[in-house]
Amino acid sequence: MSAIKNVTIVGAAGNLGATVFKTLVDSGKFNVQVLRRPNSTTQYPAGTKVVEADFSSVDALATALKGQDAVIALLGPAALSLQRQLIDASIKSGVKRFIPSEFGGDLSNAKNQTLLPFLEKVKIQGYLTDKSKSSSLTYTYIYTGAFLDWGIEANFLLDVSNYQPTIYNGGNQVFNSTSLDTVANGVVGVLTHPDETKNRAVYLGDVKISQNDLLAIAKKVAPNKPWQPKHTTLDEATAEADKRLAQGIVDFQTIVPYLYRSIFDPEHGGDFQKNDNELLGVPKKDEKFIEQVYAKKLA
């Protein structure tokens, strides 16, 4: 495959999107443009090429994507379905590579495919795979496991906000975790290795760690805090989520236990057995990085 030069990012404003955007621009390897809806008010750095299009119109999107080599979708859960139009527009405009909004659990694991947060992602994968068979569009799925720094800062992997973090299933299960910087560098790696990453999943990671490991690091950084961890099980957490779902309540509180299942339950493959950092030229961060994140958070 010829080199990828012109890259469009859709969803460049979120935590991951902003990091990927900056990393692509700073690499100096690509001409980067941001695609957004006409009513978007998000501001980007001076000099950023921003194109607007009606996301309900494949023709409008195809016009916006004319001359582009790759499209990176970094969309939130509510916007995942828009990728169908983006895929169709990419094919119509001759885009070579489409990277969908994955960046999470390993969706080759059959148990993950049944979890609420991943249902639409699985459908998009099927749609993209089918479309690629009858067109020149190729794809790469990027699996990262849990976001490391974001997961710490947002109290997602371990809620230290009141020094009473909830530990699931004993807290010893090791899981793959990836910092936002490493995810972004992985995207650069995919785009600079188009043949090696064609029509396949790639696996990124920094540190394999457990909740108990994270708690130990937090205690090391802040030994004088009144630490009192609480224990529960994934079964209890997902049972409560099932009840909320049955009541028609679909919010972050409902979704989180299913995400924890994908991370902390060994049957869901959160402890990745594959890693493509070396292939993509992406260095790994270590536990010192985690200490730095906690030192800042718990200061």
Regions found by a protein language model. Give the residues of each.
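Oxidoreductase cofactor-interface core, primarily capturing Rossmann-like NAD(P)-dependent enzymes
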Residues: 2-45, 56-59, 80-81, 93, ...
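ADP-ribose/adenylate-binding Rossmann-like module
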Residues: 89, 94-105
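A hydrophobic C-terminal alpha-helical subdomain
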Residues: 234-299
